[in-house]
Amino acid sequence: MIDKMKVRGAKVHNLKNLDVDIPLNKIVGIAGVSGSGKSSLALGVLYAEGSRRYLDALSTYTRRRMTQAAKAQVDEVLYVPAALALRQRPGVPGIRSTFGTGTELLNSLRLMFSRLASHRCPNGHYCPPTLAVAAERKLVCPQCGAAFFAPSAEELAFNSQGACRTCSGTGTIRTVDSSTLVPDESLSIDQGAVAPWNSLMWSLMTDVCREMGVRTDVPFRDLTEKERDIVFNGPAEKKHILYKAKNSNQAGELDFTYYNATYTVENALAKVKDEKGMKRVEKFLKEEICPECGGTRLSEAARAPRLRGISLDKACRMTLSDLVNWVEGVPPSLPEEMRPMANSICESFQTVAKRLIDLGLGYLALDRASSTLSTGERQRMQLARAVRNRTTGVLYVLDEPSIGLHPSNITGLIGVMDDLIGDGNSVILVDHDTLVLSKSDWLIEMGPGAGSDGGRIIAQGTVSDIVKDKSSLIGPFLSERNPLSGRQSHTGDSLLHDGRIHLSTGAIHTVKPLETDI
């Protein structure tokens, strides 16, 4: 029976013609100082070869449309399974991605609000929950008799039919930042005081502005309120102007429509077709919470269904820990005949949610934008998704999954890895955290130094073998009898003797308003 991968002659980056056997169906930790070749072995050899060979089995037509890893610099790799890498720095998701969409918890929640909620009739009355929604039958309002179809889960999605029409489901709108239109009021309009006219509009707009009755040869700060209003908000009137070309003595006459400074930016934004064009415009813009949806991204109709007294957007504002408790109360709140369906939907939600809570993400709300999540938070989302897929025979390469993880949540991380092994997979774990590495079934230590001083295996075996190995650098730290002592710490006011940084902040994401000295 094949029970190990065989790597022969690995020369990726700083690896020194490395030969190593790596157990299959085990948690294999790779330790070592930064730059010792840990990731070169895990990602540059094992993942690169595992993913490349899997893709090589596909047709040429299919492979053309997929990104493939280059062949690793290695003489031979035998018995490597198809590989997936959960990288240290997952890509930053787009503006439409949230914690709820990234974990797919929002799919289950939308299904709850579609199938199990009280829906509003066209006349504003709420109908009690009914199985007619799941049967795709019309609901009949008991108060006014109006017949209507309840919204589907798709109609409650802000990336689809449930999007707010004002912000198109992003939760924010871009408006003109008036403070950027005239950055230096000591300049006159002739000297280029109105910034959008210099970069987004024809220079002729200065001449048109003069025809609108605005003085263009005095400092902008000396203009009257009426003149300033014409610059910022004046009407689109056509004016007859005389102009002189900059590079010649020729002059001419022209009828030209006046574009005020604000409309100049709005017009340019509407015509943006690429990133280069957006960069020219975005310096005049600011982002604000959408006034229509209040940042929820949902249309008014998508916010209408009520389940346990609240709407979908309010459920998405709850932290995951609070939401799990709320979902537990959904089935008992419904009529008896609806509870089997409710239990099924809620169970699929709870299974994923509890895994994320085990990984220490219970403080996040489903409406939190993915772009604001830390690297460690996004990587743990990847981990939870990997376990949910219930694959077998796959090599999972985890690159420092303990980043940002509190010691109290290490148990959840280890539980995820145990589940992957239990499903018949193999796990390669690159990490520095001794608490995580100590749970490995097999440990490979790279070193002894970084760069050209690394790339060799200085110790390998079980954790107990590494602890006994005198050549191991990490062995003493894995032992409970670690003879190494920590640096002496300062106490009291002596810490701030050489000065301090004062930090004061308002509320942002999970941070409450606070003040502290560092």
Task: Give the residues covered by each predicted segment.
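P-loop/Walker A nucleotide phosphate-binding surfaces of NTP-dependent enzymes
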Residues: 2-372, 378-394, 406, 416, ...
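Conserved hydrophobic alpha-helix in the ABC-type ATPase nucleotide-binding domain
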Residues: 412-413
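Conserved beta-strand-loop-alpha-helix hinge in the C-terminal portion
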Residues: 100, 445-479
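H-loop/switch region of ABC-family ATPase nucleotide-binding domains
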Residues: 430-432
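Conserved catalytic segment of ABC-fold P-loop ATPases
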Residues: 419, 426, 438-445
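Long, charged amphipathic helices and adjacent flexible linkers at domain junctions
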Residues: 473-503
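Walker B catalytic motif
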Residues: 369, 398-401
